[in-house]
Curated annotation (Swiss-Prot):
UniProt key word Oxidoreductase: yes
Gene Ontology terms: biological process: dihydrofolate metabolic process; folic acid metabolic process; methylation; nucleotide biosynthetic process; one-carbon metabolic process; tetrahydrofolate biosynthetic process
SUPFAM superfamilies noted in UniProt: Dihydrofolate reductase-like (SSF53597)
Domain (DHFR) ranges: 1-182
Keyword Metal-binding carried by entry: no
Protein name: Bifunctional dihydrofolate reductase-thymidylate synthase
Binding positions (NADP(+)): 25-31, 93-95, 114-117, 155-162
Molecular function per GO: dihydrofolate reductase activity; NADP binding; thymidylate synthase activity
Family in the record: In the N-terminal section; belongs to the dihydrofolate reductase family.
Species assigned in the record: Plasmodium vinckei
Gene Ontology, cellular component aspect: mitochondrion
Residue intervals passing through the bilayer: none
C-alpha cells in the first residue's frame, strides 16, 4: 500500500480533498508554515513507524502479484540490504533538507529521496542507507526487492501531486490545521 501522510473512501475523494490551495499550504520556505505541533509530530512518527509482522505476508503477496502483472523489472544495484521489517518514507529533496540533522535519516524507516539533482555522494556518510531515486518509476523496482511493511509519501507538494495524478495512493493521512499562515 502506498499511503500519503483522513482516510479517503474512494478515488474521486482523493483528488478533491487536495486542491491547489492545499498544495500551496503544505510548506513554506522549506519548512512547515506553522509552529511544530508535538502531538502531530508524535502521530506522524507513530503512523510511519508502526509495523505489524503478522500482516506482512498478506501485503507481500499482494505486492508481488501487482509487480508480476505490471512486468516491473528489478535491479538491486545500489540498494542497501535491510533485514529489519520497516516502513518506507518517500520524500522530495526539499522535504529531506527541511528535516533537522539530528533527525536524519528518519529513524526506524527506510528513507527514499526523490530528486533529479541530488546524488548519493553528496549525502553525509551517516546517511548510507538512504536511497535516492530520480523518478517515481524508479521506486517500483526498489519496492520489489526491499522487505518493507508500508510505503508512505511524506511530501512535498510536487511529490504528493505526482503520486495522486498517477492514482498511486491508496490511503491519505491528513492533518487539517485550521488557521491561515503567510
Amino acid at each position: 500500500a502506498i499511503c500519503a501522510c483522513c482516510k479517503v473512501l474512494n478515488s474521486n475523494e482523493k483528488a478533491s480533498c487536495f486542491s491547489n490551495k492545499t498544495f500551496k499550504g503544505l510548506g513554506n520556505a522549506g519548512g512547515l508554515p506553522w509552529k511544530c505541533n508535538s502531538v502531530d509530530m508524535k502521530h506522524f512518527v507513530s503512523v510511519t513507524s508502526y509495523v505489524n509482522e503478522n500482516n506482512y505476508i498478506r501485503l507481500k503477496w499482494k505486492r508481488d502479484k501487482y509487480i508480476k502483472e505490471n512486468n516491473v523489472k528489478v535491479n538491486t544495484d545500489g540498494i542497501p540490504s535491510i533485514d529489519k521489517l520497516q516502513n518506507i518514507v518517500v520524500m522530495g529533496k526539499t522535504s529531506w533538507e527541511s528535516i533537522p540533522s539530528k533527525f536524519k535519516p528518519l529513524e526506524n524507516r527506510i528513507n527514499i529521496i526523490l530528486s533529479r539533482t541530488l546524488k548519493k555522494e553528496n549525502l553525509a556518510k551517516e546517511y548510507s542507507n538512504v536511497i535516492i531515486i530520480k523518478s517515481v518509476d524508479e521506486l517500483f523496482p526498489i519496492l520489489k526487492c526491499i522487505k518493507y511493511y508500508k510505503c508512505f509519501i511524506i511530501g512535498g507538494a510536487s511529490v504528493y501531486k505526482e503520486f495522486l495524478d498517477r492514482n498511486l495512493i491508496k490511503k491519505i493521512y491528513f492533518t487539517r490545521i485550521n488557521n491561515a499562515y503567510t
